[in-house]
UniProtKB/Swiss-Prot annotation:
This is 8-amino-7-oxononanoate synthase. Its cofactor is pyridoxal 5'-phosphate. It comes from the Bacteria. Substrate binds at residues 21, 137, 358. The keyword Transferase applies. PANTHER family: 8-AMINO-7-OXONONANOATE SYNTHASE, CLASS II AMINOTRANSFERASE/8-AMINO-7-OXONONANOATE SYNTHASE. It comes from Bordetella petrii (strain ATCC BAA-461 / DSM 12804 / CCUG 43448). Catalyzes the decarboxylative condensation of pimeloyl-[acyl-carrier protein] and L-alanine to produce 8-amino-7-oxononanoate (AON), [acyl-carrier protein], and carbon dioxide. Belongs to the class-II pyridoxal-phosphate-dependent aminotransferase family. BioF subfamily. The modification N6-(pyridoxal phosphate)lysine is found at residue 242. Pfam families: Aminotran_1_2. Pyridoxal 5'-phosphate binds at residues 112-113, 183, 211, 239.
Amino acid sequence: MQLLDNLDAALRKLDAQHLRRRRRTAESPCAPHVRVDGRDMLAFCSNDYLGLAAHPVIVAALAEGAARYGAGSGASHLISGHSHAHAQLEERLANMLAPHLEQPRALYFCTGYMANLAVLGALAGRDADIFSEALNHASLIDGARLSRARVQVYPHADLDALADMLAASRAQTRLIVSDGVFSMDGDIAPLRDLLALAERHGAWLVVDDAHGFGVLGEHGRGVLEHAGLRSPHLVLMGTLGKAAGVAGAFVAAHATVIDWLVNRARPYIFSTAAAPAQAHALMASLNLIEGSEGRQRRARLQALAQQLQARLSLRQWRHQPTPTAIQPIVLGANAHALRAAAGLESQGLWVPAIRPPTVPPGTARLRVTLSASHIPAHVDRLADALNQLDNEACHA
């Protein structure tokens, strides 16, 4: 059949470019030590930054929520799927972020991808201008495209270029859209400067804090707390399946923005609500994040990142130290990244290669992600293996 032949040819082309992707099967809970395809591995690739995914308090809360509310919601939020657990979670998130938003409310989504499509589709339209960061996540890129707004991409962290674009815009509705923590690089957006530009030009600042929420700030409130921001111009998206350890995402903003999303955000309106048990479990997760245990876990995570940075002595590869859990090591060629990942796997270390289109061509990398559940001995083992492989690459 010609249609299948065309797909087979396209897959063979991906193989030739070292770009074909295949799934691995984890057979154990998310933790530093995992069983993958029948083999025990030490993982440095999950987004479980605080090590909460298998926390007994959260696991117990999930079971309690399932016993109380059942396995599923049964309908969308605007029909009969909006449970007491969802309402409690949204109120809890709004209160948590109240120091950074005026008249805050929150909206719970099934995924971060859905949340970003919802925000950009509802706030922008044909007559709007979106100014999108060059290294934004795919969900922000797709959300901007689907909004039908005019999209301009500004170079990574280039505030002068963004200021020029804003000054030239004549649109009544303008949105500056940026990751808070860049998912493949681990650096933090210059949010204070972005907010200053948004307020000066009467624009929304939409921040995707998928990798900062729970990790950054004294109370784990993410990049807004880290940068000390408060403004009615802010629209925040955060994920709840990474540092929070469960699933889903939220949008937090001024109450009027949230009311508009409830009425106009198609991904929210036309999707079955997430299981109430997840929302119930997330209440336990947020208590841990904001409490003393959360502070201890964030401090441990920072110490592990500093340890890795101090222990690496790379000559051929390029490590980009960051203040977050994401520590990228750029190798360049796709084949080199795959070879390095295979070399680590042969030593029982799971660090997948990240290749285009996830990262720009020529910047294939190992994306090392740390968790508060790691211990210093884990980091030493990883650093020794990376230094060894880098040394071998120098002499290849």
